């Protein structure tokens, strides 16, 4: 089932036909803790959807309703208004939003993580050894004159969120090679919009997430580099975000959600669940079987996010002049 980008209604995807669920439990039914509404862009959603299909939230007494959103702005606005209980996105976007608004954000649970070795490897050739090394990548058309970070001077680049970590990583990579980024433009696009925009010439390069990135590469797009190899430090790359207000109102449900996510992440790291997870990715994103078969699945974090994983982000954003105010992260982790 392909997803149309935009603000989607609650998403219902049939569970796997196999009657044996990965999260089945012989224990008595848990206390009903109600429903949590989870917003996400399509690229991040499959892990949570797989958990829904496999009964992982039900095991903890939760119902999770996924909602597809087109952008970070929509997801964050939904957290503020209370339309969404959770939003899957990067910690850097949460810090950015907290700095630019009167919002008490909270990281509830991790999605995937990057290691120091992965970050280091992503700065070296070959950039595409048959699969992506990290989950977002700068791509250009096959015949583009852009070959390196320096060639991005005075170019237009499509990113998923303005002043996000991908934009930050590009600017840091350009600085590293002495490139002038002052006239490089960034336009906010969805993953689905990036390929067509590049083909039309609206942008010179794009930064899609997998599986959309792999789909473009299989269609002829050429890699330039990984922004996160220059922006990120080892630790959580994408997380489940909420607001302090929602946490206070639904503490028990959030505690159960946190436990369920860690179990889901553990299960997704097991080779035995590779096939069913890839089927979910195809179903949620509308990606082809050929694309999904090529994906390098990221390592899911099996521990709660620590302060050390996010402490660097405010200074990183300040150095890029994305934020100017101090951000207090002492209460930004749900414990």
Where are these regions (language model features)?
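Hinge/cleft segment of the Venus flytrap/periplasmic-binding protein
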Residues: 325-335
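Secondary-structure end/capping motifs
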Residues: 248-324
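A ligand-binding cleft/hinge motif common to bilobed small-molecule-binding domains
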Residues: 88-102, 171, 176, 204-222, ...
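C-terminal segment of classical bacterial N-terminal signal peptides
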Residues: 6-14
């Amino acid at each position: 089932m392909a997803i149309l980008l935009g603000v989607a209604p609650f998403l219902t995807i049939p569970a796997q036909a196999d009657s044996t669920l990965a999260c089945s439990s012989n224990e008595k039914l848990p206390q009903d803790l109600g429903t949590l509404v989870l917003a996400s862009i399509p690229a991040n959603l499959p892990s949570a959807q797989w958990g829904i299909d496999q009964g992982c939230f039900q095991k903890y007494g939760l119902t999770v309703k996924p909602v597809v959103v087109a952008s970070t702005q929509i997801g964050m606005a939904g957290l503020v208004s209370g339309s969404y209980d959770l939003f899957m996105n990067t910690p850097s976007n949460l810090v950015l939003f907290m700095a630019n608004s009167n919002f008490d954000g909270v990281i509830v649970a991790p999605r995937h993580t990057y290691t120091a070795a992965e970050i280091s490897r992503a700065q070296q050739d070959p950039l595409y050894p048959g699969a992506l090394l990290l989950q977002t990548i700068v791509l250009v058309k096959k015949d583009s004159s852009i070959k390196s970070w320096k060639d991005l001077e005075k170019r237009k680049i499509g990113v998923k969120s303005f002043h996000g970590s991908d934009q930050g990583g590009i600017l840091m990579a350009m600085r590293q090679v002495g490139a002038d980024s002052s006239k490089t433009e960034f336009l906010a696009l969805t993953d689905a919009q990036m390929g067509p925009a590049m083909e039309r010439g609206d942008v010179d390069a794009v930064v899609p997430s997998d599986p959309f990135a792999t789909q473009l590469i299989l269609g002829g797009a050429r890699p330039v580099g990984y922004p996160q190899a220059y922006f990120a430090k080892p630790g959580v790359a994408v997380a489940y975000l909420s607001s302090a207000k929602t946490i206070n109102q639904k503490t028990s449900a959030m505690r159960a959600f946190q436990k369920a996510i860690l179990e889901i992440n553990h299960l997704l790291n097991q080779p035995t669940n590779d096939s069913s997870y890839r089927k979910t990715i195809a179903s949620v994103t509308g990606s082809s079987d050929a694309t999904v078969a090529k994906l390098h699945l990221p390592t899911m974090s099996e521990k709660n996010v620590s302060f050390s994983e996010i402490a660097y982000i405010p200074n990183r954003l300040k150095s890029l002049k994305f934020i100017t105010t101090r951000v207090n992260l002492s209460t930004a982790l749900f414990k």
